Amino acid sequence: MPVPLGWDDDIPEQPNCPYYQWGRKDPLCPSDGTTLNKDKTLYNSSGNSFTMKRTPGGVSTGTSIKNPTTYNYKTSSPYDWNITTYYDYWNATNGNKTEMNDNSVVKTVYDPNPVGFKMPSPDAFTGFTQNGSNETTASNFNVESTFNNGWNFFTQGWKKGPTDFWRANGYRWYNDSGSLYYVGSYGSYWSAGPSSGMYGHDLFFYSGIVYPQHEGARANGFSVRPVSE
């Protein structure tokens, strides 16, 4: 998919897509499209505005489904929104695998993506640096031009083919009640793979780094960029 899940084309220049906690299906409140880390105004089916609820501590899968607009944050270990550890929320055939891999992802009922799309495998982002490793040296970033609210990554090998723009949507931090951080400066995108009982594999970047093998706490709210099934 050429844009993050839930992207709003009314304000294409700025980050404005919703965030997801690892393994959850429901989107959480996006930023308002500015770089001020401000929540977007939400409206219910009656047209009345409301704010995203924030609840400390872990909850069950069922509780999270019944409360789709609630951010469940954690300030102590384990840093997971769920009171039970699962490894296959976004890949039905994952089992208990936690290592980086390029295994086939089988979509689950918890996958937030539309028909025809699914979560990417953990290795999906490794083409964004020269050797697939976490990089702080700009010459090893597989990008075109300079950082501008995100990176234009090459998509067909090292410095080859067309580019895709990946926005720096910021993230919701698990350790601060799900508050927005670094909108327009940092980008974090989940993969389908867990890296442990507390963390998930993700892509993390800003102007000075590209980490295709990053690990983020599952209770964080990151962006989602799906791939075709």
Spans of features found by a protein language model:
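A short glycine-rich, aromatic-capped structural motif
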Residues: M1-Y87, D123
